Amino acid sequence: MKLQRHLLLVVLIIFSSAFLFAQKQTITGKVTDSQTGQPLSGVSVRIKSSKNSGTVTNSEGRFTLSAEPRDVLEISYVGFKTESVTLNGETTIAVSLVVASAELNEVVFVGSRGVARAKIETPVPVDIIKVNQIGLPTAKMDLTSVLNYAAPSFNYNKQSGADGADHVDLGTLRGLGPDQTLVLINGKRRHQTAFVALFGTRGRGNSGVDLNAFPEAAVDRIEILRDGASAQYGSDAMAGVINILLKKDINHWTINTGWSGYYDTRNNARKFNGGNQYYSGNAIDGGSYTLSVNNGFAIGKNGGFINISADFLRQAKTYRQADTTNPQLNKNSLAYINTGRRAFGDGSVTTGGIMYNMEIPFSANGKTSFYSFGGYNYKASDAFAYSRNYSAKPERFPTNTDGTLINVPGILRVSNDGETYYNPHIQTHIMDISAALGIKGSMGNDWGWDLSNTIGRNDFHYYGDKTFNASNLGKSAPNHFDDGGFNFLQNTLNLDVSKYFKHVAQGLNLGLGAEYRYERYAIYQGEDASFKSLTNQQIIYPNLVGDGNYDSLRSPAAGSQGFPGFSNTDAVTANRTNVGVYADGALDVTKEWLLDGAVRFENYSDFGSVFTGKLATRYKLLSNFNIRGSISTGFRAPSLAQIHFSNTLTSFSGGALVQSLIAPNTSGIARAAGIPDLKQETSVNGSLGFSWKPVKNFTFTADGYIVKVKNRIVLSGLFSKDDPTLPPSFTSQFPSDVATAQFFANAVTTTNVGLDIVADYTMKWDQNTLKVLLAGNIQHISIDDIHIPSALNDSKLHQKTFYSDREEAFLKASAPKGKWSLGLDYTRGKLGFGAHLTYYGKIVLLGFGDGASPSGDNPNYSGINPQVPTDADPSVYVPEVFNYNAKVTTDIYASVKLSKNLSIFAGADNVFNVHPNLGVNPLAKGWAGDNESGGPWDSVQMGFNGRRLFGKLAFNF
C-alpha cells in the first residue's frame, strides 16, 4: 500500500511537469552587442520549430513573446552570428551576439527609421566607412580628407587664396553643393558652419558642415547615403546624407599619434626663390602632428556608458611655385615671376577638440534611456592673401602724407629687382560647440519613441595680420586688426515614434515624427580701423609720377589689407523658425520585395511651405542579387547667411585688385537689380541599380542616378558702378568706396547624371588576408537654364556679367567627370602592406581674361569667352582655358603590429609626386596666375602640394 502511494505520487509529478512544460509562458529578454554591450534593435527572435512565431527587439534591445518552456529560440541580426537558445523553463534571458567577421560593416541604419538591413539589401546605395581602418594607413590627418580618399562620390579640395574658404573644409556629394548634403551625428541633424563660400573652385555661394569640427577619434563609422532623402530628413538632403556614428566602447583606451610632411622635390618654392621673390620654407614643409585619445567608462549597473574623445592637430604652411629656372625639364614650366601670389600654398592650422557620447538606462529592464552627445572644438588658422606690390599699388602701402614709403621690417620685403612687396595674413579663430540630449524608450504595444533636443553653434572670427590700413597716413602700425566675423546657432527639437507590425504582409515598420527648428545668424563688426578710411586726403605717389601712369593721384586704401573688416552697416542679426512633420514606412511586401516610402511637410517663417515625397524599392531576383531604385523630390532652404551676408572685400578680377560689395538679399541695391527674396531650391532625384554578392566575400553594386535641381542659389558676377549701360536706379545704390557689387540669387537649373560602382572582395587563408576595393563615380553636370533678374537682362554683356562662362565652368567642375579608387590591402600575421590608386578625371576652368581684348563681345569682366594675348604675338588672342587633364596618384604604406597594444604605420601619399597641369594656356604663359587661386594651379584634383610622407603609432589597451 505504501509502495502504491509512492508510485502514484511519482506519476502525478511526471504528469504535472508534462502539463506545466506544455503550457506557453511569456518570455522576455534583451539582446546586446558582445563587443560594446549596447542593445541591438530590430533583432529577429523566433521559435525555431515554428515558422510564424516570432518578434523583433525594440529600440532598447528588448523583446517579449509566448513560448513553451522547452522551445529553442533562434536569434539573428544582419552582421552578427545567429544564436540558438534553449529555454529550459527560463522566462527571462539575456543574449550577446557576436559580430560575423565576414559581414563586418554591412549593417545600415541611415535611410530608414525601421530595423537595420544588410548593406546590399537596402533600396538605395549606402557606403559604410570604418574611420579607424582607413584613417591610419594614410598621411591624411583630417576627416574630410579621409572621406575624399575613401568615397569617390565625395569630393573636396583644400583651397588657397580664397579668403575664408582657406580656413574651413567643405565637401560635396555627387557634384552638388556642400550645403545640398545633410550631415547627421547619431541620426541627429548637425548644424552648419556660419561661413558662406565666396571664392574658391568649389561651393561658391554655399554654406555647409565642417566635418573637421569634431574629433575623428570619436567616430566609429560613417554611413553615406547616396540618394535624395529630403522626405525623410528635411532640408539639405538633396544629394544624400552623411550619418556619423559615435563610438560606444568602454574600458578600451585608443591612442593614435602621427606626423606627416610634404616632400615636393619639384615645386617647393625654396628650390627657385632667387632674389627673395617668394616666401619659402623647408625641403619638407606642411609638417603636421596629431594626437587623439578615446576611452569609455561604464555608468551604473544597467548598461550605461560614456565614451570620451579628444584630439589635437597642428599643421604648418606649404609654399609652392612653378619652376621658372629650367623650362627644358618641363614643357609646361613658366618663364615668369608670380607677383600676384608670392606666398602660395596651404595655410597653417592649430586645432583641438573634445567630444562625448553617453547613454544611461533608467532601470534594469532598459525600456527607457537617457542619452546625450556633444563636444567643443577650437581652430586657429593663418593663410596668406594676395601679394601687394608697391610698383603697381602704392596706395596699399604705409606712406607719409607726401606719398613716400615707410619701411616696416619684418613685413615689407624687397626682391633683387627692387620690387617692394608684402603678403597680408588672413587669420581665423573658429569655435564650434554642440550638445544633444534625449530620452527614448518603448510603450504600449512596442511603440518606440524618441524625444530629443540638439543645439549647435559656430563662430567664425576674422583677423588681419602683418598688414596695414594705408589710409592711416604717416604711421606704419597697427599691423594686426580685429576684422569681426559671424556666427550661426541652430536648435532642433524632435519627436519620433515607430512600430514594427510583423503581421502586415511580411513586416511593416512605420515611423512618424515632428521637428521644430530655430536658427539665428549674426554678423558682428570689426574694429574701426579694419574697415574705415582714416583720411579724406588724396596722395600723389612719387613712384607713379613720370612713368606714363595717368592716375598717380590716388586715395589711400581703407581698411585692413587682405580682408577688410565687417563694418557697422554689415552687422546684422536674423533668425527664423520652421516646423516639419513626416511619415515613413518600410514594407516587406513579400520575402523578396521591399517597398519604402516617405512624405514630409515643412513650413518656414521666412519663405513659406514645402512638401516632399519619396518612393524606393528593392526586389530580390535571386538570393544574392537585388535590383533597387528610387524617385524623390527634395529641397534646400536658403541659408540665413545667403540671405543676410554683407561685406566689402578685396577681390582679384581681370588681373586687378578691386573693392567689391557683396550685398545682402534684403538690401535696396538687390531690389534695384530686380533680385527677389531668396526661396528654396527644389530637386527631383531618381536612381536605379543593383547589388550582387556572387560569393561570400565579394560584393558588387552599380547605381545610376539623375538629380535635377531648380532655383539653385549662386553668387553673381561683379557689376561695375562705372558701367554706363546699367540703369542709374541700380548704380546709384552703390556705396562711394565700392567699385563693384554682387548678389546671391536663385538663378540656375542644373542636371547631374552619373553612375556609382563599388566592388569589394576579401580573401582569407592561413594568416593572410587580402582586401581589394574598387570604387568609382562617373558623372556629367549640365546647366539647363539661367534666370537673369529683370534689371540685368537687357544685354548679353549683362547676362554674362550676372553668371559668366567662368562661373559656369566652376559649377560644372564641382566634381571631376570621373573619379576612381583602387585599394589593395594585404596582411600576414603582424605585417601589413597596401597600395591605393586614385584616378581624377579632367577638369576644365577659365581665367579672368584680358580687359583689353579686341573681341567685341569680350570687354573687361564680361565673362564671355575670356581671352588673353599670346606670348609670341600680343595682337593675337587665345581663350584662357585651363585644362587640368586626368591624373593618377599612388599611396603606399606598411604596418607592423609590434605587440597586442601597439601598431606602427608608415608610408607616402602621392608617392610619385603628381601635380595638376599648370593653370595656364601654353600659348600665353605670361598670363599664368590669372586664375582663382592666383597661383600656378587652381585647387583641383589631388591638390598642388605633392608627395606626403607619414608615420603613425596606434596604441590599444
Predicted regions and their residues:
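Extracytoplasmic beta-strand/coil segments of soluble accessory domains associated
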Residues: 64-66, 144-193
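Outer-membrane beta-barrel transmembrane domain signature of Gram-negative proteins
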Residues: 416, 422-437, 442-444, 455, ...
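N-terminal periplasmic accessory domains that precede
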Residues: 91-97, 143-146, 150, 169-171, ...
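Short acidic/polar hinge/loop motifs at secondary-structure boundaries
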Residues: 64-65, 188-226
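Transmembrane beta-barrel wall of Gram-negative outer-membrane proteins
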Residues: 251-254, 275-414, 418-420, 427-438, ...
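C-terminal beta-signal and adjacent terminal beta-strands/loops
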Residues: 193, 709, 780, 839-863, ...
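Short, acidic, small-residue-rich periplasmic hinge/interaction motif at the N-terminus
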Residues: 30-50, 72-80, 88-136, 186
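Gram-negative outer-membrane beta-barrel transporters
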Residues: 512, 704-849
